Amino acid sequence: SALDQSQRMLNALEPGTQVPVHRHMETAETTICIEGYLEVVLYAEVSGQDETGGERKFVEVFRVTLCPREGKYGVQIPLGVWHSVDVKEPSTIFEAKDGAYVSASR
């Protein structure tokens, strides 16, 4: 509902899934792995644009394994932290964020 002030969703991910490096400036993100195996990768931005005015550049600073079989269930990604995922096997995750959904195109 548009009145709901939280975002909750299940997300099915396959190996090879491409999740662009991104961040959320209005909310932290909680990710819980229900099944499968993936790594959540945190980045630091090393340049706002490359020398041709192209894409931002990042360096990996931390990697968290999520795999329920190993007792590694979830991670809290702080507000504003650049992140992505590296899917190692078919996985299902639960994601939760604060606040109503706002399209990235806005």
Language-model-detected regions and their locations in the chain:
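Double-stranded beta-helix
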Residues: 47-69, 82-106
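Short, surface-exposed charged micro-motifs
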Residues: 10, 30, 84
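Short beta-strand His + acidic residue motifs that chelate non-heme Fe in jelly-roll/DSBH
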Residues: 20-22, 40-41, 75-77, 83-88, ...
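Glycine- and acidic-residue-biased ligand/ion/polar-headgroup-sensing regions
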Residues: 26-48
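A short glycine-rich, His/Asp/Glu-containing loop-to-beta-strand
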Residues: 1-21, 27
